[in-house]
């Protein structure tokens, strides 16, 4: 079965923010929450690189391991999802994530963070019934419609790729061979190291 992955090629990203805008608009993401964001490394310096960051849906996701109520889980195709009805807002997932993907929209005077929100790889939530309630919690389920995440579809330079991990890695190998060097695949080894090593 396909193992869904993201890849951001820093050599191609032009920091246009199409991916972040597409995500916010597609899923009606609340103010203050960014399921996907752009980061520029070495901003204003020669050789600066921009990367699009979100949940990378890691092979061995540390957020799953630290969640005390098991609200974070991985689907059979490798997408890391969460159940907002189970989330207690402890924030352990935020501290465990190397990409800073889990976010908490509300904070109170007593330290409660509210329910965690993060990229769902456009796969909706645990019910996947397409209901209005499901949409309000998790956004649109494009995967059930046979589509890829909108952030990757909207990337005009194809810096952000999403889909079957074998296909994505083949595309990146071809780009690397054409360029003569790699290193533009930000987050790939951090998120998918265990599966790449074992194959």
Give the positions of each predicted feature:
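Non-ligating segments of multi-cofactor redox enzymes
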Residues: 1-199
